[in-house]
A protein has these predicted regions:
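A conserved structural/catalytic subdomain of Rossmann-like adenosyl-cofactor enzymes
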Residues: 53-54, 60-223, 230-302
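Conserved S-adenosyl-L-methionine
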Residues: 1-70, 78-80, 101, 122-123, ...
Length: 302
């Protein structure tokens, strides 16, 4: 909750202008409004509107383009829309019926230049081979700053959905130099339908992911603004066998803008040592001899 004298002059802005949300599910609208009220925000703009419908241009012309500083979103997965009712400006970015692609395009439009977003998407967005999939990923890389991708384990949304997902972290405008990846394998809860809290070391990668993201941000800021040493970035995030690593945008472009973490993560396999075949054969022959002796003893008993 926002309290204290320092924030008092901004109370009206916090209550009426800072927070916005759009949905056409009335239950979600009520939940969102209650969440805002419980956090001390009584006048948040939680509005009944299909964000992808062409009516958004008429109902909220100011908000549908170049308006928001920050967008956090968990859009519906794997839906399909009739193009005739979809915002034509969004279709101008990516020609598709798939809602998971359209929402990312819509968010790009709604952000101000320099605005930032964190968006949860199904894994298919990262590696889909259709023209629309590749077009959207190219847009994120070439005309915006795709800063990071956090790969999530498949059970994080159980019992409601078991689909594998990832978080896209991007800034509108500019161009991408490199993309930071994090292979998050545990979020502090079991990955079954019960989602029970886990205790002990290794049960939650989130604190490490946040720490590594902050470290990466500091290094990239130093590199871009202060002429930092690129070798420092390479030393810290160049090892693709680790959970956190970075990939140059040129390498991604040469891979048809594939953004799946498994495309770039390197797995080190421990080398197995096997006994000499002659030793194994000798052991098998000894076992066979022992078995034959036991069979003869059994035959004598009969």
């Amino acid at each position: 909750q926002y309290t204290g004298d320092l924030l008092e002059p901004y109370r009206e802005h916090i209550n009426k202008q800072m927070f916005w949300g759009f949905d056409f599910d009335t239950t979600m609208l009520r939940v969102s409004s209650m969440n805002m009220m419980l956090h001390g925000v009584n006048g948040a703009n939680i509005l009944y509107q299909d964000s992808l419908n062409k009516s958004v241009k008429e109902n909220y012309p100011e908000q549908e383009e170049d308006f928001f500083d920050i967008i956090l979103a968990n859009p519906p997965f794997k839906g399909s829309l009739d193009e005739t009712n979809t915002n034509p400006d969004v279709l101008g970015l990516v020609k598709t019926k798939k809602t998971e692609l359209l929402f990312v395009a819509h968010i790009l439009r709604a952000l101000k230049l320099g605005g930032r977003a964190a968006v949860i998407v199904p894994d298919g967005v990262l590696f889909g081979s259709s023209k629309a999939h590749q077009q959207l990923r190219k847009e994120l890389i070439e005309n915006n700053q795709l800063e990071g991708i956090v790969s999530l384990p498949s059970g994080v949304f159980k019992p409601y959905a078991g689909v594998s997902t990832a978080i896209l972290l991007f800034t509108k405008g500019g161009t991408t130099e490199r993309v930071w990846f994090y292979d998050l394998q545990a979020d502090g809860y079991s990955l079954d339908d019960k989602r029970t809290p886990l205790k002990g070391e290794g049960g939650n990668d989130l604190p490490d992911a946040i720490a590594k993201w902050k470290q990466y941000q500091q290094l990239t800021l130093r590199h871009s603004r202060e002429g930092g040493n690129p070798e420092e970035l390479e030393k810290t995030f160049g090892d693709k066998t680790r959970k956190a690593f970075a990939v140059n945008a040129a390498d991604i472009a040469s891979s048809k803008y594939d953004l799946s973490i498994n495309r770039y993560k390197e797995v080190v396999y421990e080398e197995e040592e096997y006994e000499d075949p002659k030793v194994i054969l000798k052991r098998l022959m000894a076992l066979e001899k022992e078995i034959m002796g036991d069979l003869k003893d059994l035959e004598g008993m009969l």
